[in-house]
Amino acid sequence: MSFVRVNRCGPRVGVRKTPKVKKKKTSVKQEWDNTVTDLTVHRATPEDLVRRHEIHKSKNRALVHWELQEKALKRKWRKQKPETLNLEKRRLSIMKEILSDQYQMQDVLEKSDHLIAAAKELFPRRRTGFPNVTVAPDSSQGPIVVNQDPITQSIFNESVIEPQALNDVDGEEEGTVNSQSGESENENELDNSLNSQSNTNTDRFLQQLTEENFELISKLWTDIQQKIATQSQITPPGTPSSALSSGEQRAALNATNAVKRLQTRLQPEESTETLDSSYVVGHVLNSRKQKQLLNKVKRKPNLHALSKPKKNISSGSTTSADLPNRTNSNLDVLKHMIHEVEHEMEEYERWTGREVKGLQSSQGLTGFTLSLVSSLCRLVRYLKESEIQLRKEVETRQQLEQVLGDHRELIDALTAEILRLREENAATQARLQQYMVTTDEQLISLTHAIKNCPVINNRQEIQASESGATGRRVMDSPERPVVNANVSVPLMFREEVAEFPQEELPVKLSQVPDPPDNMNLAKNFPAHIFEPAVLLTPPRQKSNLKFSPLQDVLRRTVQTRPAPRLPPTVEIIEKEQNWEEKTLPIDTDIQNSSEENRLFTQRWRVSHMGEDLENKTQAPFVNLSQPLCNSHSNTQQSRSPTFSEELPVLGDGQQLRTNESLIQRKDIMTRIADLTLQNSAIKAHMNNIIEPRGEQGDGLRELNKQESASDMTSTFPVAQSLTPGSMEERIAELNRQSMEARGKLLQLIEQQKLVGLNLSPPMSPVQLPLRAWTEGAKRTIEVSIPGAEAPESSKCSTVSPVSGINTRRSSGATGNSCSPLNATSGSGRFTPLNPRAKIEKQNEEGWFALSTHVS
């Protein structure tokens, strides 16, 4: 690489041109976005402008006016003797207290308005309310918590209501004026004396006025006369001051401070010339015009020196001409003002009901001062009276608040008591509602039990049973046979009745020794001791429960008295081990008693008597053997609960209903006993009719006996209580059924007569099996009990009596002693020779049939 100098100035040959630099495109300036940087939103509204103007207006015009007077007086006091200082000082304090209070009050009100406007959110509005507060009965704390006032509010109130607040404001303003004036220490001491003088209370100020009023006025007048005399000696007789009268001088007294201030200002400029008093007075009365002239003079100082003689002459001439009118107008204004004050005082006195004092005529400044002082005295007196009245009102208010607090506590206590009573009432209503529900349930269950429990009785039989008749004979017609009420009772029934304690029986039984077989039961026992002859399906003993006394009596009745052929039902097979399970512990009996009672009430249904004889003879039968007697004796103590177990558990207040139900139960038991006697009497009468026929009519007599007994006998579960309406209906139905039974009995008697005429003995459609009773053999008692859960189709279907399931319950030889057939034999051996002998034995032992049971 070679370094060759090349001439830059020469032409470039073969040199490649440099590419032009591209200029950057200037970005287009965006337009002014008024929505983002618009400052018109910050422009002051007209209301803001007005408020700013009001804020920046000068409010010290009157203060400046008094400041000028004070400065002039201070300069004068330094030159005068100390004797006159006290007089001028008092005069100045009086003028300040009388004339400057209005301006100071306005300033104080403005400041207080600003303070209240700034602090109005600290004290929100409070509304009196009566809260619904309930206090506990034993609480010592009050129901309403009183909120204490904030600390700021109390401080603010103390600062506003402080009596020295106005004077403090005056002192601050005067202190600022003195600091701006820059006078000597004597002036500061004088200001302090003025401040202390202005800070005196109103009462002390009034006392000073009353003591020194006359002395002060006399000194003022002497001072004024001396000034007039000195000025008249100095000035020539042709000056306008000679035209001034005493009234004009009095008019100028209100502006004495301004006059002295102007004199002190004009003395260095016109030391050689004397100033006319008329000019000074005109300057004071027309302060605005004089200020404008002074401003013009300050702007043109050269012209001011040349025009001084002309100005003095012209101003003196104008003021001398207008002075009487101005002084008169000033006095009129003062008189008008004092008249307004006295008029306002008079209206206030009328409004408050005080004595109205007449207007006082004032002449000059003396009357003006006296009227003001008297008005102030009256105002102070009225303020004292209003303060006393306000204190009385405050005391009365406190007393009323205390009484109100007592009343509120009483109201809270009453409210708590009312709430407690409401709670008790609600609890009582809940218990009453529950009691009503349980009562309704009991009534419903009782109604169902009554509907399922017909009573076969009439009023004549009730009266006969109550009178204690043991036997009766019913004679419907001369053709009808006599019904004998003397019937025999089986030994088994008598033995088990004797086994029951007296208090455990549902109906009180008279315990008598066992009568012989040939004695009549009606003569030994009352009518109401017999249990009803019922056709009830006994409950299946599926558990180890024991029967209640009433249920046990009904069960024994079914066991000891076999029934003849009955209407169509479902056969129920009972096994002997079900009855032997009763010997289990008593605890299981207590635990399952409710289930057993429920099964007992559900399975024992009411029989209906209106079925035909053909349907009655088609029902299958169940042969139930009698359980062992020793099992009864072993479990007698476990099966002896009180009769109250049969009743439902009653709630509070149902003792009366319990008594009524017991009375009705006793009445029903008496009716059942009467029906049993009637049934036995009818059977006995039928047996008496059938016995003369001999052995050839055994089967037919058995059939007739079964049919008549099934027609005339009606059994049902014992109801707890019956309503009067249903009782009347039941009695009417039972009377009707009794008439039907009697009609059927007559038909059977006629059939017996017809059968007796026939030579060939009729055979019974259903043969009773013969059983041989030996000492070591087993016994069998046939009892036909229809099933409680038979379907309705069994009424229409024809079932052969032979096809019925016959079950035999056998017991060991130990039960022979309790057998109703073996109870009378000493050796325990009894073997019936033929069916007739067996039937006769059954008639002697008091066998009776169970009525039909139709589900």
UniProtKB/Swiss-Prot annotation:
Sections of the chain in a coiled coil: 325-437, 725-751
Keywords: Cell cycle, Cell division, Coiled coil, Cytoplasm, Cytoskeleton, Mitosis, Phosphoprotein
Example GO BP: metaphase chromosome alignment
Modified residues (Phosphoserine): 640, 644, 760, 764, 819
Recorded GO CC terms: centriole; centrosome; ciliary basal body; cytoplasm; intracellular membrane-bounded organelle; plasma membrane; spindle
Claim: Coiled coil is one of the keywords in the record: yes
Biased composition (Basic residues): 291-311
Secretion signal span: none
Cellular compartment(s): Cytoplasm, Cytoskeleton, Microtubule organizing center, Centrosome; Cytoplasm, Cytoskeleton, Microtubule organizing center, Centrosome, Centriole; Cytoplasm, Cytoskeleton, Spindle
Region feature (Disordered): 166-200, 291-328, 790-834
Modified residues (Phosphothreonine): 235
Composition-biased stretches (Polar residues): 312-328, 794-828
Known role: Regulator required for centriole duplication, for proper bipolar spindle formation and chromosome congression in mitosis.
Assembly and oligomerization: Interacts with CEP120.
Name of this protein: Spindle and centriole-associated protein 1
UniProt source species: Homo sapiens (Human)
Organism lineage: Eukaryota, Metazoa, Chordata, Craniata, Vertebrata
